[in-house]
Amino acid sequence: MSTIEERVKKIIGEQLGVKQEEVTNNASFVEDLGADSLDTVELVMALEEEFDTEIPDEEAEKITTVQAAIDYINGHQA
């Protein structure tokens, strides 16, 4: 099975339509990967589905980079 980091990066690449090598840990969804607000909402929904978790809106607003998404999922896995 893939690591959480690999799974998060794969989802981000697929959701934002960017090459996997562009999805670096310190990449910002908006500034580096070209996401808009709708993209980020869809990304959070995809992460929730993949990891069977719920990300509250106030937490989702803080997830603005690849590393932040990885850290959140790592911290909230059952």
Swiss-Prot record:
Any one Gene Ontology molecular-function term assigned to this protein's record: acyl carrier activity
One Pfam family of this chain: PP-binding
Biological process according to GO: fatty acid biosynthetic process; lipid A biosynthetic process; lipid biosynthetic process; response to xenobiotic stimulus
InterPro entries per UniProt: ACP, ACP-like_sf, PP-bd_ACP, Ppantetheine_attach_site
Effect noted on mutating S37 to A/T: Loss of phosphopantetheinylation, and inhibition of cell growth
Post-translational modification: 4'-phosphopantetheine is transferred from CoA to a specific serine of apo-ACP by AcpS. This modification is essential for activity because fatty acids are bound in thioester linkage to the sulfhydryl of the prosthetic group.
Cellular localization per UniProt: Cytoplasm
One annotated Gene Ontology cellular component of this protein: cytoplasm
Pathway: Lipid metabolism; fatty acid biosynthesis
Residues the record lists as O-(pantetheine 4'-phosphoryl)serine modifications: S37
Domain spans labelled Carrier: 2-77
Recorded superkingdom: Bacteria
Keywords of the record: Cytoplasm, Fatty acid biosynthesis, Fatty acid metabolism, Lipid biosynthesis, Lipid metabolism, Phosphopantetheine, Phosphoprotein
Physiological role: Carrier of the growing fatty acid chain in fatty acid biosynthesis.
HAMAP family associated with the record: Acyl_carrier
Quaternary context: Interacts with MukB.
Family the entry assigns: Belongs to the acyl carrier protein (ACP) family.
Protein name: Acyl carrier protein
Species in which this protein is naturally found: Escherichia coli (strain K12)
Taxonomic placement: Bacteria, Pseudomonadati, Pseudomonadota, Gammaproteobacteria, Enterobacterales
